[in-house]
Amino acid sequence: MRAKISSQAAVAIFLALVTCCLGTVIKGLGVSGVFEDTLVVFEKVETEDVGARLVFLGDQRPKNPYGGTVRVLFQPGESGTCSIPLLQVRYSNCTNTSAAVFSGCYRTDTEFSVPRANRGTSPGFVSLRTPTMLDSGDIYVTVHLDHLPRPDAFRIKFVSLYTGNETVRISTKDRAGRDRDSYGGASSPVGGRDSNRRTASRNDDGDLPLALYGPCRPCGKNCKNLREYLLTEESWHEWTSVFAPTTVAPTTTVATTAMRSTTVSFATMTAEVITSTGTVSMEPHNTTTADMVNLTAADPPPSEPVPALNALAIGLVVGGTVASLVFLSVILGGLISCCARRRSARRLLTRSNSAREMEDLAPSSEDARTSRMSPDVVELSELVNGAPLSHRNDIGGDDLTSISSASG
């Protein structure tokens, strides 16, 4: 007896195989994510793609053209009280209904990003430039399809062991005079100028950690279960204003080192850059959310592969149609000429058969022709001519006159 495998068992086996080969597989409402639970970088890298591979499993694949948005959030490893927006990419009019999500889209727009977080090589990934230890934390990838009521979210733990070369000490103060760490968490009141200072690593390009490029949005009671919170429609609408396009933050040069101004809402920040030449202090200054960085204008124009593919497809269809017509015309011409030749050969064969039949029917000698004449005519011809009649044409006008006078 042959055992039958149900569809659910087949899907479970497939997911088990994919999990063993590629990592964790989570099936969401609209899309599924394939990713590694923990991604570790042991040394310096130019860029590192972090995220989840987005796929359609089972009945998730849409039957009509669709669109959607991908958002990437960063929760610093040293602070579990807030999260920072890194990237937002919008995909429109995706007509290719393959297993890969957002493939064959007519338009792809990077609506929001920070200087060190760009769009990855595939949807669902963010490309981090030269990540350091302070870029370690949790990366959340949220995906919202336009035709679905709520988004899907996936969590990837990212760890970088690269320390960087330069060091930055940063402390912040809120209006109450309390120190706030660079990730937005409040600590005890300030005891002195150097108290409760944090040490951050700068990479070779002089860039600050990801946590210092945008305001860390407090998540309150939702921080412990941030992924479950990001699965709600409420969270998607709350983050919409945070991911709105903003202006590019100005840069300040200190001791020949370019340092981007950080963004901490309603806070006063004091920074010291420790270099080989000594310590340079910066005066406290107020920053607003206008310092958030949006690289939409700096991004290269989004690629639109589908129109190009459509033009190529149209060219192939037209060329194939013309070639088919030429091929059919050649075949039809050959058939017509073949039929004409066969018809001509049939006519010639019919004529030759008719001529052969006539020859067979024609008498072979004079005696045979004479034997076919009427006996009376033969007798009269013999009486007049005195000799046997050889042909009908032998009877002339004089013979007829003689016959008539003799009979008279």
UniProtKB/Swiss-Prot annotation:
Stretches with biased composition (Basic and acidic residues): 172-182, 194-205
Virion surface side: 24-311
Intravirion side: 333-408
Topological relation to the membrane, as annotated: Single-pass membrane protein; Single-pass type I membrane protein
UniProt keyword annotation of DNA repair present: no
TM helices/strands, residue ranges: 312-332
Superkingdom: Viruses
Coarse class of the protein's main subcellular location: virion
Alphabetical UniProt keywords: Glycoprotein, Host cell junction, Host cell membrane, Host Golgi apparatus, Host membrane, Membrane, Phosphoprotein, Signal, Transmembrane, Transmembrane helix, Viral envelope protein, Virion
Summary of subunit composition and partner proteins: Interacts with gE.
Protein name (record): Envelope glycoprotein I
Species, as recorded: Psittacid herpesvirus 1 (isolate Amazon parrot/-/97-0001/1997)
